Swiss-Prot record:
Keyword Cell membrane: no
Annotated gene: psaC
Boundaries of every 4Fe-4S ferredoxin-type domain copy: 2-31, 39-68
Protein name: Photosystem I iron-sulfur center
UniProt membrane topology term: Peripheral membrane protein
Amino acid sequence: MSHTVKIYDTCIGCTQCVRACPTDVLEMVPWDGCKAAQVASSPRTEDCVGCKRCETACPTDFLSIRVYLGAETTRSMGLAY
């Protein structure tokens, strides 16, 4: 089943989500819009197992990273018709 990993602009570049991911779905990439000059990216979403450890590791008040599991993807992201 396919999962969607969404990274929001509230990412503070702390790398906690990257370190928490057991399947190396995430990586940090340079970004000038972040205090840390880097932001999380999810180039390998096909490897996501949906464990949501990245969400749990995120220290921001509003989770900067969210994993939407299969069928909940369009509904949770507000894309359902």
